[in-house]
């Protein structure tokens, strides 16, 4: 893996490869609670 700074590594940093940082996923335990939290988060982020 060429990081562009002259250092080669066999593994990626904890953030992963920047080209793939476009999608995020979340897993919840309960259906209704997860829907409520998703709605709350979408309203509060605006």
UniProtKB/Swiss-Prot annotation:
In eukaryotes there are cytoplasmic, mitochondrial and chloroplastic isozymes. Belongs to the class-I pyridoxal-phosphate-dependent aminotransferase family. It catalyses: L-aspartate + 2-oxoglutarate = oxaloacetate + L-glutamate. It comes from Pseudotsuga menziesii. The lineage of its organism: Eukaryota, Viridiplantae, Streptophyta, Embryophyta, Tracheophyta. GO terms for molecular function: L-aspartate:2-oxoglutarate aminotransferase activity. Homodimer. Keywords: Aminotransferase, Pyridoxal phosphate, Transferase. Important for the metabolism of amino acids and Krebs-cycle related organic acids. In plants, it is involved in nitrogen metabolism and in aspects of carbon and energy metabolism. The keyword Transferase applies. This is Aspartate aminotransferase 1. It is an enzyme of class 2 (transferase). Its cofactor is pyridoxal 5'-phosphate. It comes from the Eukaryota. The keyword Transferase applies. Its EC number is 2.6.1.1.
């Amino acid at each position: 893996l060429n990081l562009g700074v002259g250092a080669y590594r066999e593994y990626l940093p904890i953030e992963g490869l920047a080209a793939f940082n476009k999608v995020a996923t979340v897993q919840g335990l309960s259906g209704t609670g997860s829907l409520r939290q998703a709605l709350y988060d979408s309203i509060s982020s605006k």
